[in-house]
Amino acid sequence: MENKKTKLTLSGIAKKSIENIELAKTQSKNSVVIEKKPSKFAPRSSFTRPASVRSKPAVSTTSSFPPRTASVPKPASPITNDYEKRKLAEQRATRRLKGDTGKPETKKRELKLTVSRALSDEIEARSRSMASLKRAKLKENRELTKEEIQESLKPVKRDVNIPEAITVRELSNRMAEQSSNVIKHLFGMGVTVTINQTLAADTAEYLVKEFGHNPIRETKAEEIIQKIKESRSENLKNRPPIVTVMGHVDHGKTSVLDVLRSANVVSGEFGGITQHIGAYQIQHESNKLTFIDTPGHAAFTEMRARGSKLTDVVVLVVAADDGVKPQTIESIKHAKAANVPIVVAINKCDLPEADPQKIKNQLLEYELIAEDLSGDTLMVEISAKNKKNLDKLVESIVLQAEILDLKTDFESKATGIVLESKIDIGRGAVATVVVTSGTIKKGDFFVSGLKWGKVRALINDKGENVNEAPPSMPVEILGINGAAKSGDDFIVLDSEKEAKTLSQNRAEESKTGGSPLTFATQDSAFADKSAAELNIIVKSDVHGSAEAIKSAINQITHDEVKPKIILSDIGMVTETDVTLAKASNAALIAFNVKPSKEAKKLAENEKIVISSYNIIYEVLDYIKLRMSGLLAPDVQEKIIGTAQILEIFKVSGTGKVAGSKVTEGEITSGASARVVRDGAIIYTGKISTIFREKDQAKQVSNGQECGITLKDFIDFQKNDTIEAFSTTTTDRTV
């Protein structure tokens, strides 16, 4: 084949002429040689400007360089410049990254001449286009058999975890189903719900089966604790008693605690001791005792509300020179409410004005009878200052513990109670836990309230790292994922997955709140809440009046709310009563009595209302009023207009607009509205704007067409129904 030569002239790019390019085809079909023809103008470097001549020199028409031919390539001159060497190395590295091996390829695309390929020295590697990938995917799908296509269209059966309470939205997400389909299915069963409605576990399990999935019931914390108790062996061992020291702030409670700790140091077991946490252990002969500081009133009330029985013995400190004080009485009430035995320590017996017998007589009013008065309450006369009879006090505690016969399993999964929790810089969340059963070990996974974690470190009351914590031992635990609450339970579980799942379930249940919807409540869109309780504290002048008020209040009955008298006593309203009312959120009633100055001041600071009456009927009316405040209001709904969506439009600056026709009543801008699709309510909110022939309107009547926009909703579909309605709220009474 003869050599052929083709000329290609490119010009007009960026208003600059481009030199002629000569293409020479060699004998090989796949080789193309691109050359630049020599310019008929000499380069600028060939011009000379004499110094004596000011005018422009004549331009030479001959080229100063001879034309290069394709057949005789000019040998490359050696590169001596560092910059050129570095640039050449970068170009070679770029070609290697792009996969350019220097070998000629036979792709048709590379034979196509373009301007960029003509002017550049490198040929960039091209990646596969999206269109090419799409064509390959379609070709692959066409090759599938009919059976394979049907198999791919089958619904996926999933394992769905079901907690005790779950919202419709969350259940739909776990099943990977549309919320509207779930709501529609419930509506077909006669249950009207919203997307945020809470469903009971039984209802959710039924729905999961209806949609063809596999329901998995998640274990409740109570069931886990019960399994732990059932798995405990019969080889029970005695555990140290957990003792709480309570009393009035000026009666030497702190001094007794300090002396007990210092006595333990003198025993020679440790060279020094520092209380790092709010609880500690002491050694008395062969017995260990765990002491915890008096918790705050709110924390103690919270523990009682949770039904936890952390304290085994209460040591009540009473000053022999001062007698029974309000906080002393409060401590007695808390201990009796928790059904915990009391050991009385009559302190400051070294003072001349001390009268221990007077203290014993005062305690008779609160059913604390000393042994020398033919009672069963252990009372010890001590002096924290002189360290008098402290051994007798400890012996009395040990004796009371022996009577209680405190035993537990040391080898089972550990459980405990959180005393306090804090966020420590450098250590993160730290929880102080007292172990009630089992043994906590490093590496254990656990759940505490709504939190979970892995035990990274165990620190005892002396600041020492330990590997395990047996029953009744107080420890600081590092590794929790957040600050737990005082009174939260502490449960060791088998795995991280189990701990995380239980924590998430508890968090989900706390967020949903209220009673979940079951088929028993399918007539209402919202489930009836369990009966609320109104806590009541009654203080009266005489015992007979207190009993009469208590009896009359207990006769007030209602399906949704009930009264609960947590304290009925005689005497004026004290600071103790105000504190208890705040801790338990109770109504405080003073019948024929007045509050003390201290109680009145505390009530003002804590915003606690002290209601004073002298007629029983007025008390009952007040209780009914407070109970009525706990009832949900009666909401009456009236539909004022409906509209059918005919078309959906997109308007710039507004978004999606539902082109609708009013079929009944009137549609008013700003009115409450809901969207109904296939019988299921998918949205409830407000009407934002109404358009009438591109103008905004306040109201559209029956038979007219309009455009409607809703607040925070754009998922319109044809044939949806928009219902505008009004509600009237009426307070309910007991």
UniProtKB/Swiss-Prot annotation:
Protein name per UniProt: Translation initiation factor IF-2
Protein family (similarity comment): Belongs to the TRAFAC class translation factor GTPase superfamily. Classic translation factor GTPase family. IF-2 subfamily.
SUPFAM superfamilies reported in the protein's UniProt record: Initiation factor IF2/eIF5b, domain 3, P-loop containing nucleoside triphosphate hydrolases, Translation proteins
Annotated organism of origin: Pelagibacter ubique (strain HTCC1062)
Region (G1): 247-254
Sequence segments annotated as region (G5): 383-385
The protein's role, per its UniProt record: One of the essential components for the initiation of protein synthesis. Protects formylmethionyl-tRNA from spontaneous hydrolysis and promotes its binding to the 30S ribosomal subunits. Also involved in the hydrolysis of GTP during the formation of the 70S ribosomal complex.
Signal peptide: none
Chain ranges of the tr-type G domain: 238-405
Span list, region G2: 272-276
